[in-house]
Amino acid sequence: MSQENSSQFLRNRPKILLIIFFSALCVKLLIFFLATDPIVFHKYPYFAQRISEGFDIGERILDLSPLYLYINLFIYKIYGKNWEVLAVLQIFLGSLNCLLIYFIGEKILGRAVGLIAAFVLLLYGNLTVVELTLEPESFVLLFNSLLVLILIQNQAETAPTKNSWRWLLAGVVIGLAAITKANALLLLPVALVWVWQKHPSPARAIKAMLLVTAGTVLLISPITIRNYVKFQDFILLTADSGKVFFHGNGPGSTGMERADLPDQGFAEESQSEPDYAHVLFRKAARALTGRHLKPSECARFWFGYTLDYMRAHPLSAFILEVKKFFYFWGNYEVHDIDSAYKNYRTLQTWPLLPFGIISALGIVGLGLALKQFRQAFLLYAMILVYLFSALVLFVASRYRLPAAPFLAIFAACTVTSLYTQLRERRRIRLLACAGLVAALFAGTHLFFRSEIETLDRWQRATRIHYSLGGNMLFKKGLYREAIPEFAKAIELEPGFAPAYNGLGMSYAVLNDFEQAEKNFRRVIELSPGIDQGYLNLGLLYELKGEPSKALPLLEKASRLNPGNPKTKEHLQKIRAGGEK
């Protein structure tokens, strides 16, 4: 396309908007139909269905995004269990967000930057993977972009009578983002700084700041009141902040791989509720203190516990933060949802943009746009907010994702700069800029490579071969087919106890008692503090007609997990048989 034709195209705004939206929608629908498995992570749908059926989910409501839970409830009321409707809605919102990023880029750095940024974002395949997980990130990204657009528009309107309501609207959007994902509250100080520096008079600035704050409080306060009325506990939004802080900074955290309670995954598996770790953390806090802590006190306990650990290991804590900083810009995507990780691996074979190229181009763009810092302040601030959030918590893909749309704008800034240098034949600057991008791109792949490979091996073992492989096949009754999947998980991670447990149960159902016993004993060896190994080995002995061997194992399982009804049932059965 010649320069004249490209200029003419850039002037045709309606055509640009249609091309962006439908290109994004087509790419996302192709990923939805061709590269993703059926939805298997149903945390929000599960609780929405429970509430709809009249059940009180108790403290679990404090573990969930308030707005997203109610969106799920609304979808369930209309469409029932057809959760694909919500997935399609989220990729529609993702396509709409590409348009918003175009508008933001256009207003701040020019139409060409906006257009390229929109295409960078729609070709970032991992974004669509996250949009399809039935988690609230799609709505967070949408609210973030709306907030930036509103703030930019308010800057353009100087008449106080025209834009007072817009400051209130900005606060409402911050509130919507916060009741979707609590760390979005960090956007409030960003908005207040923007208001202060852009207003010509202190009096008008203070009025606008009060309106922004009022809009935010208007959305947050109903959730806070709900929490206090229901639990007699002051909880602003959710009660999982201490748990998440422990994940990112506690013993065993690597920056990408989170710290967990001992045998947490194993303990979660025996529960019917999804994402049961929240309950386990509250139980652990109450057990360690010997008091029935309120949910907010449990969160404070884990904050205190983690801070004590960090103070006791200051050098390790510092190194961890350095790692998190580099991981934030790295190419590798850390997924904490099984299906998302599998879909991410599938998309690696597609001709889409990895985060590494967006990161490398974006970092260079951050430098190139410094001369327009005041104008682009909000873009810098949005990236810094989520960098700070990742440093405080951990660098899972979902946690850094809200920075990606704004990083895409800076990436587009680099692309337009490279094009200008090429067109004007500034070879030295072109080579220097391109060389820097290439070096940064290589860095996003090479930093801490061995740790990334270790984590990816763990992800393949636990998520693909265990959760989505052997475990799912076992639940379908395909026991013989499940065995090689469990075995593959063990081959990749020999210390992963749940895979031995799955193998043992599969062999037991297939009447290979010798192999079943061998695997259950390995479970006990690896996870002596969890009841599953003792329970299953006890049940195996009971099945073999050896109640004297089963009894001590079931008693041990009962001591470890007194509330397990299956253990109680079989203990009573064996004891009743012994009394006859």
Describe these PLM feature segments.
Residues 34-47, 57-71, 80-84, 234-238, ...:
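Extracytoplasmic catalytic/substrate-binding loops of multi-pass membrane glycan-assembly enzymes
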Residues 236-323:
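Membrane-proximal stem/loop segments at transmembrane-domain junctions that anchor or position
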Residues 88-109, 146, 150, 360-367:
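Transmembrane-helix motifs of polytopic, lipid-linked glycan transferases
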Residues 84-85, 291, 301-302, 308-379:
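Membrane-interface anchor segments at the N-terminal boundary of transmembrane helices
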